[in-house]
């Protein structure tokens, strides 16, 4: 593996944040400097955490996932007041979801290791699985290449239930068939059998989406020391009850903090991402197997436009009795993470970084400071045949990231012809239209009754010219079919559906191509935190 860095243009909050723009950096409590991380350690030492209860839960949960010894030791280390975490989170995508989930975990592992060395304190890596998520459409699919097209392959469970990812039971037989169909789209390699066995081992131990995700991730990173947490685990929810109560008692201040910070964001020229009602309580409650967002209505906590209603006392009582019924929304999830974990740094993608910039005053309302927010490492893999295609087309490795691949293809094709087809036909149509306009005027003067027919005649001529243009383009493309297929392969591999590779393709393809130690070998590479994109030649 060979790694290179390229500068890829970014936009909005992320671009300005990484470029050191002071205005947007002022929306975060810490700069990404070594002094800031030292200050963060000092700030965390002044706070109290329920470390022992957390350790007890995490030991039980990670042991069930068959965690390696390094993970168990890291969990135990969390009981020490001088241990901190680097954390990131994601939904429980089937087969681990898009590649960026893996890249988030790699980011967490690398930053935890670096900060432990530079700060001289114990830093452990934590990955937060968003188990409370009810949106199965976000996690029930993956993308494959089939018949020279990119296809979204959805897992249709025969017994779908309206439940969270932590509670949604998987039909193992259905899921196994779905996985086999996906692997049929991959080339048969020396690794295929082992990878299928690797995946099936995790599936057999799983009852839910979160189980399957957790087993796969733990198996993939078994020697890394990674700690997993299911955000919707009933035992974790019990530990979170005091903070749920605090949110309920301060929901108006939370909403005001969000509103005020979003006004700051607007004044800086950015468009806020988080959308909430002014009476939002920012907590979900599970009612009749449905996740219902609570709102304030004249001192009552209501859901579904008043279908459900609770007094403050009733809500607190229910939190104490059934904490597993409650979960956070986009505003309070980061707060709960801050309450539970002594967070040295949070690692997020571009979207997360943007919405965290709207939360500064929300954190302050609760009496917290936002942890340092570090943009995750971004990676694209270039396989040998794709590198050959780039070379054959005289393209640089950075070209597909800086330019639209379709545009690169069009430019290449036009360079194969002395005069661009589009330009020549536009010119021809213009000349013919001028001639025909004059001809129509002549016809009208002699026989006005033929004016309509003359107009149709012009339309027919245009149709024939466009047909000729299409046929010419088709023949030119056929002549250069070999080269144009190279562009298609580049597009599919590096910019599928016009998106970054890591937002579409799944890690199983690469495990199948390069072996079960693929992720371990990627983790051996030195990644930088300078905001540049990492390209790995395989």
From Swiss-Prot:
Coiled coil residues, start to end: 460-484
Taxonomy, superkingdom: Bacteria
Top enzyme category: ligase
EC number of this enzyme: 6.-.-.-
Keywords: Coiled coil, Ligase
Pfam families in alphabetical order: CC_BshC, Rossmann-like_BshC
GO molecular-function term, one example from the UniProt record: ligase activity
Keyword Isomerase found: no
Function description: Involved in bacillithiol (BSH) biosynthesis. May catalyze the last step of the pathway, the addition of cysteine to glucosamine malate (GlcN-Mal) to generate BSH.
Family classification: Belongs to the BshC family.
Record's protein name: Putative cysteine ligase BshC
Protein's organism: Bacillus thuringiensis subsp. konkukian (strain 97-27)
Lineage: Bacteria, Bacillati, Bacillota, Bacilli, Bacillales
Name of the gene encoding the protein in the UniProt record: bshC
